[in-house]
């Protein structure tokens, strides 16, 4: 899939080195095809790392995607330069009159705070409410998934006694749903979180369907009845070294952190981590774009976007 980015987005060069087709604005302007408009609300502190991971994950179908990165205006980022944000990001005020085929809300390192204590919580609530009418399908990741379940359904999160950290095996629960088409019976995905949403709380809402879960990591993937809201409890977009970098960071801080589960060969953190989740992560993003965005967005929704010239 061609990913359309700004000409000088820093991660563009890395994607091109990986043979991922990245189309800059100049070339895209000469393409007479329908492209998907995807908004990515990037709440992660290392924004450029997350940009790379998600763009890589979106690059595996023939559909052309134009990405708009969105940041919060009520929280000042401390790990990403202001010049980068000003150049490559929009705020909610900038995009609120636009219509998007799909939206992604990322995780954020604020799990141990109550939702209402997060300084940008009101803004995220506004975005999630707006998404009901202005984004045809929204993919929520990790904390973004927990926040979405809390906002839309009132489902609480629970603090874990120990951080859920590593790569866990999951089982597909409902093969009839296109979102898991092509998945193996058992697949792996990374988790890095201090909180969880209990299955018993989800089951109180019959409008939600659990699609995959783990004996060790709990519910991984669920969605509403029409695929407008999809929730992923882990990080299928993570690259090989993301958990390693988090592990080394926390060790340097002197935190009580266990080695990531099922990650290093022979549990030896001097060895190259095993990449066991890339194919299923790619399938998940491809299925979302194809079955819940590209094939489902009605003409009337697209026309709303074209009427206002966005």
Curated annotation (Swiss-Prot):
Substrate binds at residues 163, 192, 249. The active site is at 142 (acyl-thioester intermediate), 235 (proton acceptor), 237. The record marks 192 as: Important for substrate specificity. Its EC number is 2.3.1.31. The keyword Cytoplasm applies. The record marks 111 as: Important for acyl-CoA specificity. The keyword Cytoplasm applies. SUPFAM superfamilies: Class I glutamine amidotransferase-like. Transmembrane segments: none annotated. It comes from the Bacteria. Pathway: Amino-acid biosynthesis; L-methionine biosynthesis via de novo pathway; O-acetyl-L-homoserine from L-homoserine: step 1/1. One of its GO terms (biological process) is L-methionine biosynthetic process from homoserine via O-succinyl-L-homoserine and cystathionine. It is found in: Cytoplasm. It catalyses: L-homoserine + acetyl-CoA = O-acetyl-L-homoserine + CoA. Belongs to the MetA family. Transfers an acetyl group from acetyl-CoA to L-homoserine, forming acetyl-L-homoserine. This is Homoserine O-acetyltransferase. It comes from Agathobacter rectalis (strain ATCC 33656 / DSM 3377 / JCM 17463 / KCTC 5835 / VPI 0990).
């Amino acid at each position: 899939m061609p990913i359309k980015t700004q000409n000088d987005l820093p991660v563009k060069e890395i994607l091109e080195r990986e043979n991922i087709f990245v189309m800059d604005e100049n070339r895209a302007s000469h393409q007479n095809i329908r492209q998907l408009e995807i908004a990515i609300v990037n709440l992660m502190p290392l924004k450029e790392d997350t940009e790379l991971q998600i763009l890589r994950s979106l690059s595996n179908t023939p559909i052309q995607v134009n990405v708009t990165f969105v940041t919060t205006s009520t929280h000042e980022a401390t790990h990403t330069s202001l010049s980068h944000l000003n150049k490559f990001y929009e705020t909610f005020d900038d995009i609120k009159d636009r219509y998007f085929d799909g939206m992604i809300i990322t995780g954020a390192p604020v799990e141990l705070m109550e939702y209402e204590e997060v300084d940008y919580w009101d803004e995220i609530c506004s975005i999630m409410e707006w998404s009901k009418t202005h984004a045809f399908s929204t993919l929520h990741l990790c904390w973004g998934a927990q926040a979405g379940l809390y906002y839309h359904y009132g489902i609480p999160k629970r603090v874990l006694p120990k951080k859920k950290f590593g790569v866990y095996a999951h089982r597909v629960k409902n093969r009839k749903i296109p979102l898991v088409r092509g998945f193996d019976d058992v697949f792996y995905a990374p988790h890095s979180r201090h909180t969880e949403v209990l299955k018993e709380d989800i089951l109180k809402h019959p409008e939600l369907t659990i699609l995959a879960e783990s004996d060790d990591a709990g519910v991984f993937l669920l969605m509403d009845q029409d695929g407008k809201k999809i929730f992923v409890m882990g990080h299928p977009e993570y690259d090989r070294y993301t958990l390693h970098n988090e592990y080394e960071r926390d060790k340097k801080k002197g935190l009580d952190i266990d080695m990531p589960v099922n990650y290093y060969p022979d549990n030896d953190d001097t060895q190259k981590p095993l990449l066991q989740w890339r194919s299923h992560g790619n399938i998940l993003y491809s299925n979302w774009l194809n079955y819940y965005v590209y094939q489902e967005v009605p003409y009337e929704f697209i026309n709303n976007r074209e009427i206002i010239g966005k």
